[in-house]
A protein has these predicted regions:
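Short, well-ordered alpha-helical segments in soluble proteins
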Residues: 6, 19-22, 91
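Membrane-embedded catalytic cores of phosphoryl/pyrophosphoryl-handling enzymes
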Residues: 33-188
Length: 188
């Protein structure tokens, strides 16, 4: 889990510093003054931080240039997608134990597994476990989506920032989970 958070955090910060995209609420952070905007020079466009009345050393203004990708989205999807995979793996392991084959017991010897193709006794996994293994992993993913959409509704990110953070976080979590939890992955 920690590996997922560290990798996602590093990639997110690298992206924010390389891209430097202004946030949707940048003008509210910048507080430009009419005297600093020369309409003939800038044609009423925000060019750089020089038109801002907020000092460039201000954390608020510096953070205004770190919109892409969304850190909240990437971290939420990173941690909560990992949790979703973990929950799915947990239920998969339980169902494997419940549906394992019955072994033939030979006296005074080790148990011998019946060969493939021969009759084997198996138990069906209880339906509530099957349903739980499909529904419960969705809860963390829905929570991550809620966190991401809240950043859009708060006017802190553009939709593409949210999408990039979502893809980044979910991809890193999926990759790290499948590398470190190979025994829980479902084989097709």
């Amino acid at each position: 889990f920690a590996m997922t958070i560290v990798i996602t955090g590093c990639i997110t910060e690298l992206g924010k510093n390389l891209v430097g995209r202004p946030r949707p609420d940048f003008l509210a952070r910048c507080k430009p003054t009419q005297s600093s905007i020369q309409s003939t020079k800038y044609h009423n466009l925000l060019v750089d931080h020089t038109i801002c009345s907020t000092p460039i050393t201000s954390h608020t203004l510096a953070d205004g240039f770190k919109s892409f990708p969304s850190g909240h989205s990437s971290m939420a999807f990173s941690g909560l997608t990992f949790l979703a995979w973990y929950i799915r793996g947990f239920f998969t392991a339980i169902m494997r134990k419940l549906t394992c084959t019955v072994y033939e017991q030979v006296p005074d010897e080790e148990p011998i597994r019946l060969e493939e193709g021969l009759d084997r006794e198996t138990e069906e996994a209880p339906q509530h476990l099957v349903l739980s293994s499909l529904v419960l992993p969705l809860v963390p993913v829905i929570l991550a989506a809620y966190i991401s959409v809240s950043r859009l509704m708060d006017y802190r990110h553009h939709p593409t920032d949210i999408l990039a953070g979502t893809i980044l976080g979910a991809s890193v979590a999926t990759a790290v989970y499948h590398v470190y939890h190979k025994s829980h992955t479902i084989k097709a």
